[in-house]
Amino acid sequence: DATITSISFVSAATAAGTPTNQWFALYDSSRNLLRQTADQATLGWPANTLKTVNLTSTYTTTVEGLYYIGIMMKATTPISVHRRNVGVAAASLALTQLAPILAGASSTGLTDTAPNPAAAITADDSIFYGYCS
């Protein structure tokens, strides 16, 4: 078992411009919400910066397997998230659409609370850099 206390993501070249809501969330493989961070609301997030936010309470894993972490920012200019493209766009997108989908967009129109469960994931050809600790 592992105890998770926080989630981290790294911003890329675009800093947050006038954020109104921002949080991270932890989901199981069925996209059921396990924990989330408090809404960081209007706190700034500079470009090229690691941001670590504590969960509202710790989570201890009880099963091995796939977990998802999510990031949400509502802002006039959301950050760009540091990510790595998987490869040639057409070929890599086809690969990333194989189950289980490991990265992509999910629920939309969010503000201060993570959805439970999160919507189906639309695959992306790049992987965001984020982790739990």
Please state what every model-predicted region is.
Residues 18-98:
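Aromatic- and Gly/Pro-enriched, solvent-exposed loop/edge beta-strand patches characteristic
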Residues 3-8, 52-54, 58-60, 80, ...:
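Ser/Thr- (and often Asn-) enriched beta-sheet segments in non-cytosolic proteins
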Residues 72-133:
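Short, surface-exposed beta-strand/loop patches at domain edges
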Residues 1, 28, 39, 112, ...:
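Acidic-enriched, low-complexity/disordered segments with a strong bias for Aspartate over Glutamate
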Residues 2, 46-50, 105-110:
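A short linear-motif detector with a strong N-terminal bias
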Residues 2-14, 69:
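A short beta-strand element within beta-rich, extracytoplasmic domains
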